[in-house]
């Protein structure tokens, strides 16, 4: 009752093949693989990006004396 038998999986496979067709499933898997590769490349690029040399070098400060409210 708790687990699926071979017949259950066979029926699910047939339904998936009917809905998506034989040509659509490899195309879908290829798109998933491209997404995974792109994600891994993005994660690797993020690790290789060096931090800025001095974060405060480009920062500008503004000194302003607030006027008193009467």
Curated annotation (Swiss-Prot):
Family statement drawn from the similarity comment of this UniProt entry: Belongs to the TatA/E family.
Bias (Basic and acidic residues): 61-70
Function in brief: Part of the twin-arginine translocation (Tat) system that transports large folded proteins containing a characteristic twin-arginine motif in their signal peptide across membranes. TatA could form the protein-conducting channel of the Tat system.
Transmembrane feature ranges: 1-21
Protein name (database record): Sec-independent protein translocase protein TatA
Pfam families recorded: TatA_B_E
Subunit structure: The Tat system comprises two distinct complexes: a TatABC complex, containing multiple copies of TatA, TatB and TatC subunits, and a separate TatA complex, containing only TatA subunits. Substrates initially bind to the TatABC complex, which probably triggers association of the separate TatA complex to form the active translocon.
Single Gene Ontology BP annotation: protein transport by the Tat complex
Membrane topology per record: Single-pass membrane protein
InterPro entries for this protein: TatA/B/E, TatA/E
Protein localization: Cell inner membrane
Origin species: Agrobacterium fabrum (strain C58 / ATCC 33970)
